[in-house]
Amino acid sequence: RPSFCNLPVKPGPCSGFFSAFYYSQKTNKCHSFTYSGCRGNGNRFRTIEECRRTCVG
């Protein structure tokens, strides 16, 4: 899996509310979170399918 999958979830400090998904190394699963729209990182996906395809297994 790409190294960015291991980055911590980072919602960011802005005021937007965007549904996103991140990979958790601890659970080896993708989970939903609310992204603020800025200053996130590479461990952020638009769909759970994209997250799973990139980071799980």
From Swiss-Prot:
CDD domains (alphabetical): Kunitz_dendrotoxin
Localisation per UniProt entry: Secreted
Keywords (A to Z) from UniProt: Disulfide bond, G-protein coupled receptor impairing toxin, Secreted, Toxin
Cysteine pairs bridged by disulfides in the record: 5-55, 14-38, 30-51
UniProt remark on domains: Exploits its two major loops and engages more positions in its interaction with V2R. The pharmacophore defined by numerous amino acids positioned in loop 1 (9 to 18) and loop 2 (34, 39 and 44) may be at the origin of the absolute selectivity of this protein for V2R.
Physiological role: Interacts with vasopressin V2 receptor (V2R/AVPR2), probably in a selective manner. Inhibits vasopressin binding human V2R in the nanomolar range (Ki=3.50 nM), and also potently inhibits vasopressin-induced cAMP production (IC(50)=21 nM). In vivo, intraperitoneal injection of this protein into rats increases diuresis by 6-fold, without any loss of electrolytes.
InterPro entries to which the protein is assigned, alphabetical: Kunitz_BPTI, Kunitz_BPTI_sf, Prtase_inh_Kunz-CS, TFPI/VKTCI-like
Key word rRNA processing present: no
Gene3D superfamilies: Pancreatic trypsin inhibitor Kunitz domain (4.10.410.10)
GO cellular component: extracellular space
Family, as annotated: Belongs to the venom Kunitz-type family.
Keyword presence, Oxidoreductase: no
Ranges of residues in domain BPTI/Kunitz inhibitor: 5-55
Name of the protein this chain belongs to: Mambaquaretin-5
